[in-house]
């Protein structure tokens, strides 16, 4: 049986559960899955929205697979049952006729290595407009074009019209370098090259080994999930195509196709340790699409950008302003000023957009005009509608202006340094006057200048600024550490346990989000609550290590992933990586 030589790949043997998590590769939009309970069939989906074909920003989630009933077959073209062993770079299938191995020849091409013992191959169903078989495979033309090819001797090449598509079977004979490839792309010039399989498999192993080899080491308790987290990030990378002008990371190729603004910024936290260029590109990627008025889109996908939505209200939509904060974290690891020089002016325009176009009453407190701009899509904070003058948003802006002050100093714009510091201090003071309730010891967001009395960790966010009086910090930390509110079995729920709107399974109405915990670790550390910060970091790491996969959000009591939480979630993986490294280095 094939076993990779890389200890990293051996460590992750069978961690990838292809019934729910796609087997993919860095840059690729091809996603291979197995059916639950079916030991003889795979299917292939595309990490593309294809909105020109099926309108709607989320319709891709329900689109049928591009290739269905992908099977391993014997000499007669009959399906073979298999047992699969998964690795980051390959799927290894044991059958009665021998071992098949599936890997990526390149980001658009899957390569099957077939047993040399007897003729065998693959079969599949596809739904194209045109089929054209030939001597060593064939081509299909549709929304995405597909070819299947072999470098072996063709025994059977059967293409049957099913009425709604085609059923294909290709059986070949050959040796250890014989392969069958599936190539899928948008263009008409299909790549029919079939490389010797052993070289293809070795290249895939070396590619992933190098990916893992470049990352910092961590202490043993974190190691297994740590390398899985690095696989999650690598597996979620999408290559340049259409509006993607550089590599970017999808939040989850399984559920969120595209690049979301604040997800990208959190992803940069991990990449700064192993690939500073990729880290910086997560930031540059969003600025590639900055609007003339300074706004940065909510999300970008191959066919376009998301800058406005009609639901639940019609308004411009973006994401929280943490770009300068993330850029400074990248700089702290790399000491490379070039990124700061490059993005400073665009970030200034982004900051001006918030204050200039999102303060309807001109009181210096900025609002969300669309709930999705908060990133907290279904939070009870928006139950009464928008616009909302939000505690979290003004905290982000305070952090952003502080980061701009640091950037200005580093790139030699000293006069602007003090200006940004003054602006950050002034906003922190306005937040106390505007939002703080001394009786409750909480900051309340407001709609129509009436407090929204929903207890969430965002009522504690101003702690992060480091500019609150000690008496206020003490009140905020007391709430944070209250086991009846936020210090749950697994802190921190996104709605307090004792709030009437708390729902531990519904997205932003109760579950734990790893990025929010990451922010509070930083906030606590900044304000001198080192022991609590370390405790929260460790409990966050333990929460993520408690499940096989890495999820979008977690139940604060059971630690399990609620049913709708996306798997292989990027910012959860990135924040886990950052916390694991810093805890291993005793930096928290």
Tell where the protein language model's regions lie, with residue ranges.
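Short N-terminal secondary-structure initiator segments
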Residues: 187-195, 233-257, 313-352, 441-449
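Extended glycan-interaction surfaces of carbohydrate-active proteins
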Residues: 219-258, 286-287, 292-313, 359-389, ...
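Aromatic-rich carbohydrate-recognition surfaces in CAZymes
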Residues: 257-370, 391-394, 398, 511-533, ...
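Structured, solvent-exposed acidic/aromatic patches
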Residues: 387-392, 414
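Terminal accessory carbohydrate-recognition/targeting modules of carbohydrate-active enzymes
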Residues: 1-221, 254, 262, 274, ...
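Extended, well-ordered alpha-helical scaffold segments
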Residues: 196-203, 207, 221-228, 275-288, ...
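N-terminal start-of-domain structural block
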Residues: 1-8, 149-183, 296, 301, ...
